[in-house]
UniProtKB/Swiss-Prot annotation:
Superkingdom, taxonomy of origin: Bacteria
UniProt-recorded name of the protein: YcgL domain-containing protein VIBHAR_01387
Cysteine disulfide partners in this protein: none
SUPFAM superfamilies: YcgL-like
Domain YcgL: 1-84
């Protein structure tokens, strides 16, 4: 299965996967407005491949069922909370 990947011009770290290059007909208009101008990244074959940030099987299922897949960046890590948790664990040992 081939898919084309586009980077958002408005939301950093946000990518849109679609099954056909430059065919955004299955993507809701409201999503396209929030996404901004799609900037082409690459076209790849998904079969037998792994992706760094997302499960390739979820991408394939979404492309088949919805006609697109939206990859959003993970939420920012709260380093202060992580530090507090580590300190609490050290005190408990």
């Amino acid at each position: 299965m081939l898919c084309s990947i586009y980077k958002s011009s408005r939301k950093e770290g946000t990518y849109l996967y679609i099954p056909k290059k430059d065919d955004f007909s299955q993507v809701p208009d409201t999503l396209m407005q929030m996404f901004g101008k799609p900037m082409p990244v690459m076209t790849i074959k998904l079969d037998g491949r792994t992706l760094a940030q997302v499960d390739v099987e979820k991408v394939k299922a979404s492309l088949i069922n919805d006609g697109f897949f939206l990859q959003v960046p993970p939420p920012p890590e709260n380093l202060l909370e992580k530090y507090k948790e580590q300190k609490a664990q050290q005190k408990g040992e």
